[in-house]
């Protein structure tokens, strides 16, 4: 009976950690998307200096979270998001608004996908 209780406790702890991870990652992805929207808003209004500063801060924050992300997510998914973010940085540097909007949209969708992958759902369990 004691072994059964330990197994149940371990299962409950794993589920709790999974829920905390999901909530954290969802919050981070939402924050990154909000900051990315600020980049595209600034670029759209012609304020490239603000766009450059905002995307640089976003990139620094993204890079600071890489260790955690690599422990909790699939590497190819992180690499896709990283590539898209670097494209956004480049497009801000060369002031290519159309390409920036395209890359930002893809990156926003990728961050939504990353958050969705960690949510506790039947789709993710099966």
Question: Residue spans of the language-model regions?
Answer:
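C-terminal-biased regions
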Residues: 1-41, 52-126
């Amino acid at each position: 009976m004691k072994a059964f209780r330990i197994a149940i406790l371990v299962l409950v702890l794993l589920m709790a950690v999974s829920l905390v991870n999901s909530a954290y990652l969802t919050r981070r992805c939402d924050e990154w998307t909000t900051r990315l929207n600020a980049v595209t808003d600034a670029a759209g209004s012609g304020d490239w200096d603000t766009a450059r500063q905002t995307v640089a801060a976003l990139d620094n924050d993204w890079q600071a979270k890489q260790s955690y992300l690599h422990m909790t997510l699939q590497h190819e998914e992180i690499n896709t998001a990283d590539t898209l973010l670097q494209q956004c940085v480049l497009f801000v540097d060369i002031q290519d608004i159309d390409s920036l909007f395209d890359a930002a949209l893809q990156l926003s969708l990728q961050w939504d996908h990353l958050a969705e992958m960690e949510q506790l759902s039947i789709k993710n369990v099966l």
